[in-house]
C-alpha cells in the first residue's frame, strides 16, 4: 500500500511530499509513526 507523506523531515532536503511503500501491520509497530509528521528514516 502506498501512503503519501506530507511532513517536514529532519534532513537537509525537506520534500513537501514523498511516497513510501509500507505495510499497515508494520506501521502499527512504529513508535515514530505519530502526530505531525512521519519520518521514514530515509532521505
Swiss-Prot record:
**Top enzyme category:** hydrolase
What are the recorded GO MF terms, alphabetically? hydrolase activity
For the keyword Protease, the answer is no
What keywords tag this UniProt record? Hydrolase
Q: Does the keyword RNA-binding apply?
A: no
Its EC number is 3.-.-.-
Q: Which residues form a coiled coil?
A: none
| Assembly mode | Hexamer, composed of two different subunits.
Instruction: Name the job this protein performs.
Output: Irreversibly hydrolyzes L-canavanine to L-homoserine and hydroxyguanidine. Has no activity on L-2-amino-5-(guanidinooxy)pentanoate or L-2-amino-3-(guanidinooxy)propionate, or on the L-canavanine derivatives methyl-L-canavanine, L-canaline or O-ureido-L-homoserine.
Listed name of the protein: Canavanine hydrolase
